[in-house]
Amino acid sequence: MTQTLILGHERVDDIPLIIGLANKLHLAEVLDHHMGTHRLQQGLHNGQLAVGWLAYILSQADHRKSAVRDWANGRPHTLEYLLGHPIRAVEFSDDRLGGVLYRLSEDATWDAIERSLWTATVTVYEFTLAGIRLDSTTSYGYHRVTDEGVRQRGHSKDHRPDLPQLKVMAAAAEPSGHLIACDVHAGQCADDPLYTPLLQRVRGIVGRPGLLYAGDCKMAALSTRAEIAAHHDFYLMPLPRTGETATQVDSWITAIVEGVQETTLLWDGERMRGAGYEFERPLRAMVDGSPVYWTERVQVVRSPTLAQRQQATLEKRWAAAEAELRALTPPPGRGKRQLRDADTLQAAMTRVLERHDVAGLLTATWERHETTVTGYVGRGRGGPDRPTRTQVQVRYALTGVRRNEEAIAARRHRLGWRVQVTNAPADRLSLCQAVRHYRGGWSLARAFHLLKDLPLGLSPLFVWKAEQITGLTRLLTLALRLLTLVETQVRHGLEQRQESVAGLYEGAPTRTTERPTGTRILQAFARAQLTLTHVRMGRSTGWYLTPLSSLHERLLQHLHLPTSLYTALADNSS
């Protein structure tokens, strides 16, 4: 009797790793507890749906709802084992996933989820919380602007101001960069008033006083600083050069340049981080109708790296301004417009110098050219008896552009200076430590880069309703938390053992690294094409899994995940 061999295949790749990490954080239970599930909904609960969708996003680098259903139906055995529930063909339908986004869009629900998730994260994993970094970013999309929508015209950090924007405010733990809280706002909102609500949420999530909150100059509003000081926390941020503060900052820097104020070299071990000085000043502000008094340390510091960067920018502006000045008075010729008035030339030169911010640094010299032209009066052919008329044509021409070395030297002395403020006592945060802490604030900027880049791809979002835009943005920040955990835990494990890992770079199998990225770690599983094969022949059936390599086992070990996440998928894998 002839028996038919039937083979079925499921690509496993990094799915067990992602869902295993989510299960370790009890993410499905946290989401279920706060989002809830309709009493008539059958099959997977909303928390399980969200975890499955997160696995799809991180594994396939795609956040579209429409593609999740086919992906899940191609892996029923894998997802059933990892999610602990049978997978029906309708589980990951567009309607069900849309319901998850709607529940995630509710502010109270989202706040409760972030509180519980942070508690679960610090319970499972050890985090060094040296401070909290706050910042904002924007995301564009091809959406129609509506009065009540979250997509609005506003400033774009992706250089797409022609498209509607949404704004993401986030707070991350330093130095790990793990997200603590995230708020979604309409794209036209200014940053300044958005810091205080986020600070209040973070304070409730972390539940610890005395933390150091760092941010950029948009966080330096007096009301924001007062809010932090009133709750016995600390802040660190640069002051903006706007309004009255700009005048104060210039005077503090002038005192150094003119030799009135001495500075101290800032050493970090054998590395010099710059120079600077600090002084204290008392501040007062109203918080919730009550006065708040505190002492602020003003730190005027110079960064050699920043000075070099500003010097290079200044030289580019010089060159551009000089080229534009010379182009104002081209040689006479067809199509060459000539300036025939001294006031017009002077006004044009002033506009060029001010536009490139080099006023006083360049001096242009010019001269007046007069040309006498004699012609016949009236129309017609000339002759000896025709009357003539003599005209004097005037044009102005630049003869040179000279750099004012004394003014340039004075400008160079002012390059690289920045003023930052903190209310932390000096015994907790010295001047050098404050400089090092602020300059080391790359963690949240990199988190934003990961959020916008593959596999998450925040821009653009392929949903249209305001609730779904907000919900999907928040779902992607959950995916970012998982991706960050993958990265930080593997790096921590390698650092503890003083090891490096090879095999993560395509085309360079022997290249090693001590700081692998989360994306490359996931790609190491995807490139292996780990496949679960279902073999059926007559009444006999079995599951077989592509063997894990030593690299995969090592990465799982650093993540504190068992290899049984993979091997248990097949009862007779080899």
Regions found by a protein language model. Name each.
Residues 22:
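Conserved active-site/ligand-binding neighborhood in enzyme cores
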Residues 1-19, 32-574:
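Anion-binding and metal-coordination hotspots
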